Amino acid sequence: MAQSDIADGEELFTIPPESVLSARTSGLKDLLSHDLNEFGPWLSLILVMIYEYLRGEQSAWKPYFTVLPQNFDTLMFWSPSELQELQGSAIVGKIGKQSAEEMILETIAPVIRKNPTLFPPVDGLASYDGEAGTQALLNIAHTMGSIIMAYAFDIENPEDEDEQDAEDGYMTDEEEGQSSKGMVPLADMLNADADRNNVSFANVVFFFYSFSCFLPFQPFKLTVSILPGSLVSRRWLVDHESYQTHQAR
């Protein structure tokens, strides 16, 4: 919320690149025999976030994790009986839980299980093997994937193409080789709004600036892509009036 007048183009804050949590800034890339880029933008960031989260106080992003949500009630976490209430809605086919879990178990789960010192088991488990271990691994991966879906930014490179929105799970085949994703501390404090926005940012130093004049007590609204209502519901479980004009008819 603005406390005083803010001019058009005035700098609000700047986030240095090294403060962004990403596959490039995390030390995990130097500890694995795998190339994180092989996992694509979504799964590589999920793996990095699991690693940094499990490091606890040793992670430079520990304070950031403390302000991020730990529990979600978005559609990815609904039970089959709860999802039955949405039968007939197109959103059911866009959740992609099964495909997301298949990708997690086929790609990042072997890395996690092979490196128990980097990824210590949670909840008192001896390992991530077995039914209990697999479920614990899926739970933490879904949590990180949901955080990314709700809060992550695209980190553009000159050679990158524009990234398209995932329609199923956390990643589509078309997304491979496109923009990396990163978690930007402090930027999460800005409300996202598809229409009534007055704050934008410029890569790669994450320079956040106003592009309209502020009056005192006017809230900051971060520029976001215009998304259909079904995708907004899947990511954030909200039905904000700003997105109603972008609903599929």
Indicate where each model-derived feature is located:
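Long, positively charged leader/targeting segments at protein N-termini
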Residues: 1-19, 23-27, 66-212, 216-249
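Short peripheral tails and domain-boundary helices/loops at the edges of structured domains
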Residues: 30-57
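Short secondary-structure capping/junction motifs at helix and strand boundaries
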Residues: 57-64
